[in-house]
Amino acid sequence: MSNVNLSVSDFWRVMMRVCWLVRQDSRHQRIRLPHLEAVVIGRGPETKITDKKCSRQQVQLKAECNKGYVKVKQVGVNPTSIDSVVIGKDQEVKLQPGQVLHMVNELYPYIVEFEEEAKNPGLETHRKRKRSGNSDSIERDAAQEAEAGTGLEPGSNSGQCSVPLKKGKDAPIKKESLGHWSQGLKISMQDPKMQVYKDEQVVVIKDKYPKARYHWLVLPWTSISSLKAVAREHLELLKHMHTVGEKVIVDFAGSSKLRFRLGYHAIPSMSHVHLHVISQDFDSPCLKNKKHWNSFNTEYFLESQAVIEMVQEAGRVTVRDGMPELLKLPLRCHECQQLLPSIPQLKEHLRKHWTQ
């Protein structure tokens, strides 16, 4: 009889997929999107958006939990966009893990994440993935840069932004649950085909959407959700990440005369701290808009050494308010400071500096 009871208990435990809308700058708690239920959000206390250009009913969201995407309908007058492409009034498009939804006018970035929940009838629902009480530590592993895949081979001018990678060196890997398929970053980290280097502390992969001829991501095996979650205990890890970044430059671009920068985005596009190692040519078809450019050429990009010094001196990283506004600044050449009106003209201008 006891064996039957155990079997029944196991039988009634079922897994349910749930969807969450997550503000990338962690200004408020994530919002649950019930399966196939229309949820309308916009300006208000739930989102903490006070911008009058954002309607109180800006978007309608309907989660297709079984299919792994959310249908987004723009209800408000001002533009809502997904990956910088405007949806259009009364139009509906799919928002998938790895894409960024800007609520209005390229502001207020959101992503969606899916979780598996174990649920017992009559009992409290238990999440398969744990999260702390700190909203900054909510995992958001779906992001454009972090999708399973790789970047351009160095020097390629192809219109493609994704080609196979060389296999990384063998090293022990700290096992971690990959969770839902949308967590492309963790999958990429664990996949030998995606790796160019790994050791006990970090792994290096090519950015799937490189913004330059050489663009790598250095990621710690330890899960750190954002720069705000970095503490003094991570100091040696940050130093090691910087050292590995420099090593990758020597190993894979040693003959190149290109200049490199190592740094972090003030507000990361995924919930796993990652160091960008990027050449300063910005010669890539994946560099498509002002947001891409300014994320690497304004104070939005925090130098690796500066981050290390902050943690060394203060025990934490200070990210000032208003960072998203930097992404809207005019296009300015990082070499000569000349203002350019468009990305195509900026790219043409940059060619002059390649020959110098």
Curated annotation (Swiss-Prot):
Zinc fingers, C2H2-type, are found at: 331-353
Domain of life, per lineage: Eukaryota
| Residue numbers covered by motif Nuclear localization signal | 126-131
Report the active site residues: 274
The question of whether Metal-binding is a record keyword is answered with yes
Q: Where is this region: Interactions with ADPRT/PARP1 and NCL?
A: 1-110
Q: Which of the residues bear the PTM Phosphoserine?
A: 132, 137
User: Which keywords fit this entry according to its UniProt record?
Assistant: Cytoplasm, Disease variant, DNA damage, DNA repair, DNA-binding, Hydrolase, Metal-binding, Neurodegeneration, Nucleus, Phosphoprotein, Zinc, Zinc-finger
Q: Where is this region: Disordered?
A: 122-167
Q: Where in the cell is it found?
A: Nucleus, Nucleoplasm; Nucleus, Nucleolus
A single BP term in Gene Ontology: regulation of protein stability
Domain HIT, by residue range, is 182-287
According to its UniProt record, the EC number is: 3.6.1.71, 3.6.1.72
Q: Which reaction does it catalyse?
A: a 5'-end adenosine-5'-diphospho-5'-2'-deoxyribonucleoside-DNA + H2O = a 5'-end 5'-phospho-2'-deoxyribonucleoside-DNA + AMP + 2 H(+); a 5'-end adenosine-5'-diphospho-5'-ribonucleoside-2'-deoxyribonucleotide-DNA + H2O = a 5'-end 5'-phospho-ribonucleoside-2'-deoxyribonucleotide-DNA + AMP + 2 H(+); a 3'-end 2'-deoxyribonucleotide-3'-diphospho-5'-guanosine-DNA + H2O = a 3'-end 2'-deoxyribonucleotide 3'-phosphate-DNA + GMP + 2 H(+)
Q: Where is this region: Interaction with DNA substrate?
A: 207-211, 269-270
InterPro entries documented for this protein: FHA_2, FHA_APTX, Histidine_triad_CS, HIT-like, HIT-like_sf, SMAD_FHA_dom_sf, Znf-C2HE, Znf_C2H2_type
Question: Which positions does the site annotation Interaction with DNA substrate cover?
Answer: 188, 265, 276, 291
Q: Which residue ranges does the record assign to the FHA-like domain?
A: 38-87
| UniProt xrefs under Pfam families | DcpS_C, FHA_2, zf-C2HE
One GO cellular component this record assigns the protein to is:
nucleus
As annotated, the protein's associated disorder is: Ataxia-oculomotor apraxia syndrome: An autosomal recessive syndrome characterized by early-onset cerebellar ataxia, oculomotor apraxia, early areflexia and late peripheral neuropathy.
Free-text domain note: The histidine triad, also called HIT motif, forms part of the binding loop for the alpha-phosphate of purine mononucleotide. The FHA-like domain mediates interaction with NCL; XRCC1 and XRCC4.
- Quaternary structure annotation from Swiss-Prot or TrEMBL: Interacts with single-strand break repair proteins XRCC1, XRCC4, ADPRT/PARP1 and p53/TP53. Interacts with NCL. Interacts (via FHA-like domain) with MDC1 (phosphorylated).
**Functional summary from the UniProt entry:** DNA-binding protein involved in single-strand DNA break repair, double-strand DNA break repair and base excision repair. Resolves abortive DNA ligation intermediates formed either at base excision sites, or when DNA ligases attempt to repair non-ligatable breaks induced by reactive oxygen species. Catalyzes the release of adenylate groups covalently linked to 5'-phosphate termini, resulting in the production of 5'-phosphate termini that can be efficiently rejoined.
- What name has this protein been given in UniProt? Aprataxin
What is the source species?
Homo sapiens
Gene that produces this protein: APTX
